[in-house]
Structures are given as C-alpha cells and as structure tokens.
Amino acid sequence: MTAPEQTFRNKKQRKQQVKLRKPGFAVAKYVRMSPRKVRLVVDVIRGKSVQDAEDLLRFIPRSASEPVAKVLNSAKANALHNDEMLEDRLFVKEAYVDAGPTLKRLIPRARGSANIIKKRTSHITIIVAEKGNK
C-alpha cells in the first residue's frame, strides 16, 4: 500500500484543500427528496451555460427543480464572488446527486405486521466553471 501524496493534520485542512481544487461549487445536503427524482432534473442542466440552466429550471414542472436552482444560484455566486469569474462565461461543469441517509418509518398493517416506508434524502453538488478554462 502506498502512502498518500499529501497528508492533512485534520479534517478542516482536508476540506480547505478540496475547496481549493473545485472553484465555483456548491452543495446542498440532506434534501428531503429521492435522488432518482433529483437526477432527472440535474441531467437536464449538465453542460449548459448557467443562464440557460436557470431558464430551464424556472420552467421544469418538477419539485426537484427548486432545490437544484438554489444550489446553482449558490455555485454561481461563489464563482463570481470568491473566484472572480465572469458571469457571461459560466457553464455547469459538473452536476451530480448522491444519496444521503434514508429515514425509515413504520406503517402498521393487519395482524400485527408493519411495512417500512423509506424517506430518502439527497446531496446535490454543482460545479460551475468558465468556458475555455479547464
């Protein structure tokens, strides 16, 4: 087993290093929505310009479009404010949805049995970048 290229003293340093590698990104964690349903919306905006993605999200008739729009807006603001990118050149470089923890609830059924209802959560990540930059 090889040693890692760079070691970190604590979790905070590791998180700061991740932020340095991914300019213009935003994450929404524990969104109370199924990842499968959120992915349908995220797949539409991947690779589009930020302005086009905002317009699309405004008119997509799915409830997942609201949290995705909030994350996109946050990523755009981070890119403009923290990384000093130009708004006209921004596009959605990466957009993905990971499954968060699942809340399990019991529903009583006949003869003393019960069914489990899985209330799924999602982690939405969007990374924006300038066109021409990799």
From Swiss-Prot:
GO process terms (BP): translation
Keyword annotations of the record: Ribonucleoprotein, Ribosomal protein, RNA-binding, rRNA-binding
Membrane-spanning residues: none
UniProt entry tagged with the keyword RNA-binding: yes
Keyword flag rRNA-binding: yes
An example Gene Ontology molecular-function term: rRNA binding
SUPFAM superfamilies cross-referenced by the UniProt entry: Ribosomal protein L22
A Gene Ontology term for the protein's cellular component: cytosolic large ribosomal subunit
Self-association and partners: Part of the 50S ribosomal subunit. Contacts protein L32.
Similarity comment: family membership: Belongs to the universal ribosomal protein uL22 family.
Physiological role: This protein binds specifically to 23S rRNA; its binding is stimulated by other ribosomal proteins, e.g. L4, L17, and L20. It is important during the early stages of 50S assembly. It makes multiple contacts with different domains of the 23S rRNA in the assembled 50S subunit and ribosome. The globular domain of the protein is located by the polypeptide exit tunnel on the outside of the subunit while an extended beta-hairpin forms part of the wall of the tunnel. Forms a pair of 'tweezers' with L32 that hold together two different domains of the 23S rRNA. Interacts with the tunnel-blocking modified macrolide azithromycin. Upon binding of the macrolide troleadomycin to the ribosome, the tip of the beta-hairpin is displaced, which severely restricts the tunnel.
Protein name: Large ribosomal subunit protein uL22
Organism the protein comes from: Deinococcus radiodurans (strain ATCC 13939 / DSM 20539 / JCM 16871 / CCUG 27074 / LMG 4051 / NBRC 15346 / NCIMB 9279 / VKM B-1422 / R1)
